[in-house]
């Protein structure tokens, strides 16, 4: 009670952290650290920042796991220390290069896109001395580039109207003239950028900040081409993403779009929220959800 902790927060007998718990702790430490050091100050050194971020980790870790944690937890803490030391060094370099952190764990409530009200949280937003902005999402494991994580090639672009006639592939033309069609398999960063455009104006870029266990893989992976039409494209990637966001939300609201990845020629998802609930028959799934399927879907 004196520490204002509930029993779920203080876990001195816990053996180790799950991946999501480790990620949450890293997020908490980074938020506290960036609030203390959002911009360049006189006397900043790599050593001083590493010392401070280490102290924040010590306090956060002890508050949750006590002063005598088990060995697996100590090893995980050591892994976090290594990652945060690299982060502190890179943070100072970013500040010296003109970047300033202007928002941390930014909560967005009731933002309207089209007819929809959305809410989400953005890990970090930076502004450069030249006025440019970047929206950052932390990744505590090794991750693909922003573009590879968000876009997947389509083997059967002609099947996309089965999901919705309003959805169109994002198409780019290679140097040899061959058109390559992509679908949006993730829309997180484009959504954040669309909000930031309204909130701050300008043309914000997006980035992942990867913090995996291997220190050599820690760093920012920027997505600088969201706003720029690529050769052979009618629209830029961001406008394509906007149209997909709006149409997919309509599909969900109207109960449309119950079609499998296989029928669209897409890779099978690594998880399926329905697999333990119903059989694979469309009829059973429709009955479970009480949805009316629109005529253009093939069942």
Predicted regions and their residues:
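RecB-family 4Fe-4S metal-dependent nuclease core
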Residues: 1-299
């Amino acid at each position: 009670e004196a520490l204002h902790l509930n029993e779920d927060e203080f876990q001195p007998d816990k053996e180790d952290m799950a991946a999501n718990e480790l990620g949450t702790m890293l997020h908490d430490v980074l938020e506290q650290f960036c609030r203390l050091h959002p911009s360049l100050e006189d006397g900043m050194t790599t050593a001083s920042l590493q010392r401070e971020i280490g102290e924040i980790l010590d306090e956060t870790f002890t508050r949750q796991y006590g002063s005598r944690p088990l060995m697996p937890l100590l090893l995980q803490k050591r892994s976090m220390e290594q990652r945060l030391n690299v982060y502190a060094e890179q943070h100072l370099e970013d500040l010296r290069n003109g970047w300033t952190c202007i928002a941390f764990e930014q909560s967005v409530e009731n933002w309207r896109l089209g007819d929809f009200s959305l809410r989400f949280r953005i890990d970090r937003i930076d502004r450069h001395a030249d006025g440019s902005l970047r929206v950052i999402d932390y990744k505590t494991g090794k991750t693909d580039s922003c573009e590879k994580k968000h876009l997947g090639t389509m083997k059967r672009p002609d099947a996309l109207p089965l999901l919705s006639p309003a959805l169109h592939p994002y198409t780019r033309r290679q140097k040899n003239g061959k058109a390559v069609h992509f679908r949006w398999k993730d829309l997180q960063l484009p959504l954040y950028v669309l909000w930031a455009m309204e909130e701050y104006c300008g043309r914000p870029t997006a980035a992942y900040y990867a913090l995996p266990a291997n220190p050599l893989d820690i760093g920012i992976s920027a997505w600088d081409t969201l706003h720029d039409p690529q050769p052979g494209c009618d629209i830029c990637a961001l406008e394509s993403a906007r149209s997909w966001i709006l149409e997919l939300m309509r599909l969900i609201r109207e109960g449309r779009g119950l079609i499998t990845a296989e029928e669209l020629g897409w890779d099978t998802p690594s998880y399926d929220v329905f697999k333990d609930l119903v059989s694979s028959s469309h009829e059973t799934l429709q009955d479970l959800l009480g949805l009316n399927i629109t005529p253009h879907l093939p069942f």
